[in-house]
Each structure stands twice: as structure tokens, then as C-alpha cells.
């Protein structure tokens, strides 16, 4: 049989989806010549072939594509910029999170990215959706020069059917990823050779100076944090979500990177809805993504079997260390970065619910990873406490989640997602307050951090995953509602005195502390003061009840 031949936007003799026609709208829009090969919506085997041509890319012993993201192995939040333009400027929460960049600077960066992409012999284009609910989903197009980036976004977004691709049309949002090429440091507003810029008027994003794939994922998340509340009055959440198999009960886990969202939501006894990004509309909760982006440091089949078994053909391993001959990954090796990751389609998780659209009203878990060791492993929250701790967004920034973060340290991230917020945090907090008031759902503060002592003092340890899972099981079964509770001083949080499968001494931080009473009191008062200082930013817009729900500083 003769090999297939190239016809317009069909396939070339190698069997790869390509575009060669000068009449193709994409070719015309990018001003490409016919010598440029465009892999348009290429399947994983094709992207593997192209990816293996990239320096340092290979296949793991389990079949995953292993790639390196260059000098940047985490997000660069200090280089994130929003274009200051007339249609969106009045809504933006300007400041350290959303840095302003002028329209002229945007045009220079966009032209720079496109000029770089035009020099490539081969480009990759991915068309996909963000948002599982058809009422709210947006069409996304990624144009990039690395097969690794194309496969990453193919995994992370919602993959259209063949029929949907035929009728895809023009995207609602486009990403130009020219991350191998630096930004112009002499342009107004630039502070480094890295720039991640979003233009809400043009609905486009430009990436320069970083090859870290997570910038694309979080760029789309930022867009949803803007579009959903403004256009649809839908709440966007930095959370994971799962659903009980028998009862159908839905759980939301709020938290920053490294606090346990992905790990805790991947539960064999529950259906996975998503591990990181969700929206909550009047229809219920829906996942924004079509994949999972799991941390891999110290990953094992025993501790996290569903994630471990998802690292197979079609998945991407990012910045991991492996044996040169056998290609077996050493998940305990952090010599490249603490932020080793794996990206895979959500349906690689056997317990995933497809489509990712639960309908029951969820109960909430506000996840924190407390590096001071003074917060309880689990606390039941009042509605006012939910508001206070959601606005505060306290956790410890985990090693490797951002450039330069090498050990855990205390941080406050409004709404547990401050790096991705576009509007003022109180706007999201008010949306959550409305949901709480409407549904009267249960809420818990779950601490996956240190027990017995602070990281700085030593002598403590991170709460074992098996105990955190036992606490969750007790909540889901209703067992934790039957036990007695006691109030922990200063933070005035109610903690259980017992929990099936969990040693009682680790439930109350005052009893678990190993460094003496004076040391504990000093540590908890120090943390309470940090809470109070942080909340001053939002106090003028908070109710008296919410302000009173904070710790006694």
C-alpha cells in the first residue's frame, strides 16, 4: 500500500497532521511560509516522535515522555503582567500580583514572540477547551515550538472530539509560547528576560524567557479567574474535587501548590473530578482542566498508587532524574528541582468521573501546610471562620513550587490562589460567602503540615498521609461528627479529641508539641500576629463577625 500524501491540512507521508496550504487561516494569521511544518492537534505518538528530537528528552521505563524545562523549573510570578487597557483595567486588582504593562510594551512582546515562532522549522498547535460545563467553557489555542509543550497542554486541557474539532472555529483565547526566546529587557516595565503577559481585550497570552510548561496552565487559570466572575458571576477556585462512589457527596479541597490537593483528591474510594482548578456555578462544580499536574518528589506506588500508575505512555515527566541506561526514574532525587512533576490526562486515573461535572452541593476543606506546627491536623469551622481563613489563605510555600523557593516558609495567599487572582480578593470571598449562606455546607481546616514542632526548631515531622486520609474517611462516613471537640487557644478552633485510625495525641497541637509549653506559646502567638498583620489589608471590607473569627493576636 502506498503511504499517505499531504493534501491541504491533511497528513504528510510520515502520517503526521500538518498544514501546508498557504490559504489556511492559521498560516495566513501567523504570516508563515510553506516551508514551516505545523503539527495541528497532533496525537501523543506524533508528539513523542518530535519530542525525542529535542535535546535531553527521552522515554522513561514506564513509557512517559521525560523532558526538561530549561533554567526555569517553576513559575515566575514576579514576571507575570497584565496589559493595562480600557476594557478591563477598572476591574483589575493592580499591585504585586497583577503588574501593569502598557499596550505598546505588549505589542513589542507579542511581535517578538511571533517573530521567533516564524523562524522555527516546525510549530505545534493545540486546540482544546477549558471548562467541562458547555455553558461556560472557552475555546483555547496554543501555538508553541516544543513538542513537550504541545503534549503538556494536550494532556492538561479538555480534548475535543473529532466532530468538535471540525467545528472548532476561532479560539476564545490564544497562547503564543516563545519561551525559548528572551523578552526585551529594555522595554518599559521589564525587569528580566522573562515575561508572561495577558491581554484581556485581545484575549491573548505571550510567554517569553521561560520554558516551564506550568506557565501556560496557570495563564488559562488566570483568564478563568477574570472571565467567570465578570461575565457569568461564576466562582473560580484553586481547589481539587472528588465525589463519593456510594453517597455521591462532593468534596472541594482549597489550597496552594504542595499542600495536598492532587494527592488527597486521588482517592481510590472516590471519583476524581479534578486536582487543581474548578468553577462553581448554579449548575454545580465543574473542572476547568482535562488533566492532572502532580508533584513527583518522593512519589511511590505504596503512598500514591493512582498517580504512580498514571506515569505511562502519553504522560509527561518534567525535570526528573533517571538512570541513563534503564531510564528508571529516581523520584527521591531533587538535584534538578524540588518541583518535579508529571502531567497526564485525567482519564489515566481509574476513578476519574468523566465528564468532570458533579451536581451535589460540596463540603469544603481549606488545606494548609503549617510549617510552624501549631495548627491542628483538622478543625471544624464556623461560617465566619471559613470566610476569615479563605481570605487569609495561610499556608507554607512549599519548596520548588516557585523559582527560588528551596524550603517551606509561612505565606498568605488570598483565597488560596493569590498568584492567579485578577479581581480584588474580597470579590471572590463574597461569592464564596453567598454559596455558604445559600447551601449551609460543612467546612474544615485540614493541616497537612508539621506536627510536634516547627520546621525551624526541628523535632517535628509532616503529618503522615495515612492519618490525613483517615481523618477524611471519618468525615465522609460521619464518624467525626460523633466525637467530642475541644477548643485550641489563641486561634479558637474546634478540634476533635479522637478520630478512628489517628493517634489522639497528634489531633491537638498543644499536646503534640515536643519543645515545651513556653516554646509553643511563643510560636502560636507569633503566627497569630502574622495573621492579624496580613488581615489588615482586607479588614475595612470584612464584617465584624468575620474579623472576630481570627486569632487573638
From Swiss-Prot:
It comes from Candida albicans. It comes from the Eukaryota. Signal peptide: none annotated. It is an enzyme of class 4 (lyase). CDD domains: PEPCK_ATP (cd00484). PROSITE patterns: PEPCK_ATP. InterPro entries: PEP_carboxykinase_ATP, PEP_carboxykinase_C, PEP_carboxykinase_N, PEPCK_ATP_CS. This is Phosphoenolpyruvate carboxykinase (ATP). ATP binds at residues 255-262. Its EC number is 4.1.1.49. GO terms for biological process: gluconeogenesis. It catalyses: oxaloacetate + ATP = phosphoenolpyruvate + ADP + CO2. Residues 1-22 are annotated as: Disordered. GO terms for molecular function: ATP binding; phosphoenolpyruvate carboxykinase (ATP) activity. One of its GO terms (cellular component) is cytosol. Belongs to the phosphoenolpyruvate carboxykinase (ATP) family.
Amino acid at each position: 500500500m502506498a503511504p499517505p500524501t499531504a493534501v491541504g491540512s491533511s497528513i504528510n507521508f510520515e502520517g503526521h497532521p500538518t498544514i501546508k496550504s498557504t490559504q489556511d487561516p492559521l498560516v495566513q494569521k501567523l504570516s508563515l511560509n510553506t516551508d514551516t511544518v505545523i503539527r495541528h492537534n497532533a496525537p501523543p505518538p506524533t508528539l513523542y516522535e518530535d519530542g525525542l528530537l529535542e535535546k535531553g528528552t527521552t522515554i522513561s521505563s514506564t513509557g512517559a515522555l521525560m523532558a526538561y524545562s530549561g533554567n526555569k523549573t517553576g513559575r515566575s510570578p514576579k514576571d507575570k503582567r497584565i496589559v493595562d487597557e480600557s476594557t478591563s483595567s477598572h476591574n483589575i486588582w493592580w499591585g504585586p500580583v497583577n503588574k501593569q504593562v502598557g499596550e505598546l510594551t505588549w505589542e513589542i512582546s507579542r511581535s517578538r514572540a511571533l517573530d521567533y515562532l516564524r523562524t522555527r522549522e516546525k510549530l505545534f498547535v493545540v486546540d482544546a477547551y477549558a471548562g467541562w460545563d458547555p455553558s461556560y467553557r472557552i475555546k483555547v489555542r496554543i501555538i508553541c515550538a516544543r513538542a513537550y509543550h504541545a503534549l503538556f497542554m494536550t494532556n492538561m486541557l479538555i480534548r475535543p472530539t473529532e466532530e468538535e474539532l471540525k467545528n472548532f472555529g476561532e479560539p476564545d483565547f490564544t497562547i503564543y509560547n516563545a519561551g525559548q526566546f528572551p523578552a526585551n529587557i529594555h522595554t518599559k516595565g521589564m525587569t528580566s528576560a522573562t515575561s508572561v503577559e495577558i491581554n484581556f481585550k485581545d484575549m491573548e497570552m505571550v510567554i517569553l524567557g521561560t520554558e516551564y510548561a506550568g506557565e501556560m496552565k496557570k495563564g488559562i487559570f488566570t483568564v478563568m479567574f477574570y472571565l467567570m466572575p465578570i461575565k457569568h458571576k461564576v466562582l473560580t477556585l484553586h481547589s481539587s474535587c472528588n465525589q463519593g462512589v456510594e453517597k455521591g457527596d462532593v468534596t472541594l479541597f482549597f489550597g496552594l501548590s504542595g499542600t495536598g490537593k492532587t494527592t488527597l483528591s486521588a482517592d481510590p474510594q472516590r471519583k476524581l473530578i479534578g486536582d487543581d482548578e474548578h468553577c462553581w456555578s448554579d449548575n454545580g462544580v465543574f473542572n476547568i482542566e482535562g488533566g492532572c499536574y502532580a508533584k513527583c518528589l518522593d512519589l511511590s506506588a505504596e503512598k500514591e498508587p493512582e498517580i504512580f500508575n498514571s506515569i505511562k505512555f502519553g504522560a509527561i515527566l518534567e525535570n526528573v532524574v533517571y538512570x541513563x541506561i534503564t531510564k528508571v526514574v529516581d523520584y527521591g532525587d531533587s538535584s534538578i528541582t524540588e518541583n518535579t512533576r508529571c502531567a497526564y490526562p485525567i482519564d489515566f486515573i481509574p476513578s476519574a468521573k468523566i465528564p468532570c461535572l458533579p451536581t451535589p452541593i460540596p463540603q469544603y476543606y481549606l488545606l494548609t501546610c503549617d510549617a510552624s506546627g501549631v495548627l491542628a491536623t483538622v478543625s471544624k469551622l464556623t461560617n465566619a471562620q471559613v470566610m476569615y481563613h479563605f481570605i487569609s489563605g495561610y499556608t507554607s510555600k512549599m519548596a520548588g513550587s516557585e523559582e527560588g523557593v528551596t524550603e517551606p516558609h509561612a505565606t498568605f495567599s488570598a483565597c488560596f490562589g493569590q498568584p492567579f487572582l485578577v479581581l480584588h480578593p474580597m470579590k471572590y470571598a463574597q461569592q464564596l460567602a453567598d454559596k455558604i449562606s445559600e447551601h449551609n455546607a460543612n467546612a474544615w481546616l485540614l493541616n497537612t503540615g508539621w506536627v510536634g514542632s516547627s520546621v525551624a526548631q526541628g523535632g517535628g515531622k509532616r503529618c503522615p498521609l495515612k492519618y490525613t486520609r483517615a481523618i477524611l474517611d471519618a468525615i465522609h462516613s460521619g464518624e467525626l461528627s460523633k466525637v467530642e471537640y475541644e477548643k485550641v487557644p489563641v486561634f479558637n478552633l474546634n478540634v476533635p479529641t479522637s478520630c478512628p485510625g489517628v493517634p489522639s495525641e497528634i489531633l491537638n497541637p498543644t499536646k503534640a508539641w515536643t519543645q515545651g509549653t513556653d516554646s509553643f506559646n511563643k510560636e502560636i502567638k507569633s503566627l497569630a500576629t502574622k495573621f492579624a498583620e496580613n488581615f489588615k489589608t482586607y479588614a475595612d471590607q470584612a464584617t465584624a463577625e468575620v474579623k472576630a473569627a481570627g486569632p487573638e493576636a
